Amino acid sequence: MRYPIHLALIERFVVLKTGADYKCQVVFQTTRVLALLAVFFLIVTSTTAFGQLRAADSARAAKYSESKRGISMLVMQNGRTIFEHYANGGSARGRWPIFSGTKSFWGIAALSAVRDGLLKLDDPVSDTITEWKGDPRKSQITIRQLLNQTDSIEGASRLQRASIRDRNATAIRLPTVAEPGSIFIYGPSHLQIFSELLRRKLKGRDTTAYLEGHVSNRLGLGRLNFKKDARGNPLPATGFELTAREWARLGELVLGRGNYHGRQIVPATLLREAFAGSQANPSYGLTFWLNQQAPNGPEGDMERMLDLPWQNAQWTNVCICKDAPTDMVVALGSGYQRLFIIPSLKAIIVRQGSNAKFSDAHFLRLVLGRGG
């Protein structure tokens, strides 16, 4: 470890000829060095305390979460569980819907497909979905824009209905509402189109088998609910049910820079692509939400903003929590299902619950010991 003590601050010891002067100089120099070391010790210990999450702070956050119908809370740091709490019928073994938190697993699958040479993020979608080639807008859409939801295609929440027999076919026929890259529209359509693109890249092989083989099985997640339609197409926007501990494994993958327990699932350089925002929404990467606008941007309730018509939502400078580190990334699901990942603190925070009025910013301030 390199200690940040400026050597110029420590006066050079000069041995004087007389015994009295020598003793005086030794006392002076020793006192000064000890004082400097004491200051340095205070700096080091205070920095460590700031970065170390405390169980007492997590307990206060858990009390708040429980009051808002929270069913689970898990806090990990440096690979260790430092706090775990269940309430309102939740349990360590009880799986719970993570809703749109499902998207982030498909985001990792997309990066795996890049690694495997199946696609490139900035490839035009129309190279694969050739029906789009004649459309002046759709022909410009890239795979990256599907994943960060800036392709300008209608969000189409109706795709989640079980009555739709072929979601993929329905999704690729949806209209654009603006120039690609110019707006952020949240909805299931974008990943549904990606699912069709991946299916064609796999030459008809099962896309769910690809996600299982390259992502979920490697995380030890077991059987997942893909909400398949009559044609066997999965619904990538939602569907997974996980325990808090299972969901935290995705956080471990992120903290491991794509490596999970010694196995490189995606290259670190590719994983970084998931955490780059777009011009249309700097707070959303490739299926992950970002806190990079903190501490200067206003805090936003992402779920409430997503309920607004896309024309009314303001994404240009919003953050999740001003007091949380800017490198925090989040897998977010309806009803305030949350997987907060903070690389600078080597921390993972899972919160699951039923839909209730809940503040991410207040919750995070409690966990981080920064008031509330």
Model-found features: residue ranges?
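Boundary at the C-terminal end of the N-terminal hydrophobic targeting segment
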Residues: 49-51, 55
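A short, well-structured edge-of-sheet supersecondary motif
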Residues: 60-90, 339-342, 346-350
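Bacterial N-terminal signal peptides
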Residues: 34-45
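Active-site SXXK
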Residues: 79, 96-122, 146, 194-198, ...
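Active-site-proximal alpha-helical segments within enzyme catalytic domains
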Residues: 193-197, 239-259, 337-351
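Bacterial peptidoglycan biogenesis and beta-lactam-recognition machinery
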Residues: 112-119, 199-208, 216-224, 243-266, ...
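Active-site helix/loop module of the DD-peptidase/beta-lactamase fold
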Residues: 115-153, 173, 202-238, 242
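Active-site Gly/Thr loop motif
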Residues: 221-224, 277-348
